[in-house]
Amino acid sequence: MSSAATADLPHVARAANPARYARWTPLSGIAFVVFFVAGVVASSPPSDSASDAKWVASYTGHGNQVGHVLTGVFLILAGLSFVSFVSVLWTRISEASRPAVVNPLPLVTAGVAAACIAAGGVLMAAAAGASLTGSSPVPGPDLLRFSDAGGFTMVGIAGMLAAALCVACLSAQARAAGIFGRKLTILGLVASVVLLASFLFIPIVALLVWLVAASIVLMRSPAGG
């Protein structure tokens, strides 16, 4: 083997590693789905109409408190995963659109959505976390209801409305850049409309479906490796 060819080997290895890494970065979209679902199932607060005693009981005991804390942790991780995925997709769009400048609105709205989801998780976990560490007793039922409702408002309303705008913008940009096909573009636009009703909770499934589909498409695309 010539010395020139040998000298090129480190360069080839360095070039291959980023490509291999880039292939798997879209998994952050699927990670959001995993963390979000885990956050939902980790704890089960009572309904708003449940008795005061049931609310206090739901936050009493090591097992219950750990569950609520895990909900907060998983939602924080979900928020980080969402903004990571959007960054990956937007970067792919920006590279494919050169020399045109791509509007960074999806990055801004993804940051807002991630912050709201994480803040909602903190609100949901705060009471249980304080009690679990022994720094305070279990709060009264009214405060427990407030923290749970406030957490859902941040996640299911503020966070999902920002996510709806993000998905709509990304879908249009990815279609224009040739990254998304017609079907995935339509799925993204439909998901963004459905998310407007996210206060009903079930419509949030539309975001999960879109993230899985978009992640698979990005992993299969040539730019992914």
Located regions from the model:
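Hydrophobic, aromatic-enriched alpha-helical segments typical of multi-pass transmembrane helices
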Residues: S2-G225
